[in-house]
Curated annotation (Swiss-Prot):
Leaf. Belongs to the plant LTP family. Keywords: Allergen, Lipid-binding, Transport. InterPro entries: Bifun_inhib/LTP/seed_sf. It comes from the Eukaryota. GO terms for molecular function: lipid binding. This is Non-specific lipid-transfer protein. Plant non-specific lipid-transfer proteins transfer phospholipids as well as galactolipids across membranes. May play a role in wax or cutin deposition in the cell walls of expanding epidermal cells and certain secretory tissues.
Protein backbone atom coordinates (compact mmCIF):
# COMPACT_ATOMS: atom_id res chain seq x y z
CA UNK A 1 0.00 0.00 0.00
CA UNK A 2 1.10 3.56 -0.61
CA UNK A 3 1.62 5.74 2.46
CA UNK A 4 2.23 2.93 4.96
CA UNK A 5 5.36 1.51 6.53
CA UNK A 6 6.88 -1.50 4.80
CA UNK A 7 8.01 -4.12 7.35
CA UNK A 8 9.23 -6.53 4.67
CA UNK A 9 11.58 -3.83 3.36
CA UNK A 10 15.06 -2.91 4.57
CA UNK A 11 13.87 0.56 5.56
CA UNK A 12 10.36 0.93 7.05
CA UNK A 13 9.42 3.87 4.85
CA UNK A 14 6.50 4.79 2.64
CA UNK A 15 8.02 3.46 -0.57
CA UNK A 16 5.33 4.25 -3.12
CA UNK A 17 7.61 3.41 -6.04
CA UNK A 18 8.32 -0.06 -4.65
CA UNK A 19 4.67 -0.83 -3.91
CA UNK A 20 3.29 0.19 -7.28
Amino acid sequence: KCGVSIPYKISPSTDCSSVK
